[in-house]
Amino acid sequence: PPTDPMIRPERRTRADLIAAAAIAAVVVLIVGFFWWRSSARATISRPAAEPATAAAKAESVPSALQQRWTATSTRTTTPVVLGGVVVTGDGRTVAGLDPQTGEQRWSYARDTDLCAVSYVYNLVVAVYPDTRGCGQVSGLQASTGQRGPSRSSYADRVVVVTSDGNAVLSAGATRLELWRSDLIRML
């Protein structure tokens, strides 16, 4: 029985090794080029270590209300309170804030400004622009900020994104899309 488990190649010349090294180098360069230019490289995802817990339901109406904190959210059309966090969208960043303190529990940012932020079920929907309009959509789990489903499509440069909690509507001047909870287009 042979003691060497490797089978010797029939031939292995210096030129063969140089060609293999050159091919490997070209592949590494191509992969590096695409990674360098990708939006994934410019994405900063800081999920929460533990899922947020939803606040207990109020048993009675309080006699007075008091403001505890404020946050800027230029990319939401209505307040988004979901999965135990208050979701804000401003500039390039979507964040999940603790509803009691306003402290950031998680954040997700890309290299370009947000178009809009909405929600469906327990999924935060962040919409970013690319060369085809506001059609780069990232889903984030509301309680942790972990990435979920995503989609990419043609869209207008300016869109209004709204939700009834069951589906998300992205409406522009010339295009309209309706997404379900896994961000599959229904319309």
PLM regions: where:
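Hydrophobic single-pass membrane-targeting/anchoring helices
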Residues: T3-I44
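A structural motif specific to WD40 beta-propellers
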Residues: E103-W106, Q146-P149, M186-L187
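Beta-strand C-termini and the immediately following turn/loop, strongest in propeller blades
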Residues: T88-G91, A126-R132, S170-T174
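A short helix->beta-strand "capping" segment at the edge of beta-propeller domains
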Residues: A48-T74, P99-E103
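Repeated scaffold domains used in trafficking and secretory/extracellular systems
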Residues: T72-V81, R110-N122, S152-N166
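Structural motif
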Residues: R132-S138, A173-S181
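Short loop/turn segments that connect beta-strands within beta-propeller blades
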Residues: D98-T101, Q141-G145, R180-I184
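Residue-level detector of high-confidence beta-strand sites
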Residues: R68-T70, S107, S150
